[in-house]
Amino acid sequence: MSRVCQVTGKRPITGNNVSHSKRRTKRRFLPNLHWHRFWVEGENRYIRLRVSSKGMRIIDKKGIESVLAEIRANGEKV
């Protein structure tokens, strides 16, 4: 499974580790992803999504029904 938030589309980005002597080596910054179950009242079932912390805040703000509609409009099967 790829490390991509299903709500925001956040994915890993690359950057540098910087030591005290300012020597740089490549590294990845991973999004803060979690598997989370959301109750969908309209479908009378749970939906399991891989979401970032920001994705959870968006769901709290907009509601799971509207967020699911957006995800499905993008062609993702949920």
From Swiss-Prot:
An example GO biological process term is: translation
| InterPro entries noted in UniProt | Ribosomal_bL28, Ribosomal_bL28/bL31-like_sf, Ribosomal_bL28_bact-type, Ribosomal_bL28_sf
Q: Which GO terms describe its cellular component?
A: cytosolic large ribosomal subunit
Q: Mention one GO molecular function.
A: structural constituent of ribosome
| UniProtKB keywords | Ribonucleoprotein, Ribosomal protein
Annotated region Disordered: the residues are 1-23
Protein family membership: Belongs to the bacterial ribosomal protein bL28 family.
Report the protein name in the record. Large ribosomal subunit protein bL28
Organism of derivation: Marinomonas sp. (strain MWYL1)
Q: Which gene encodes it?
A: rpmB
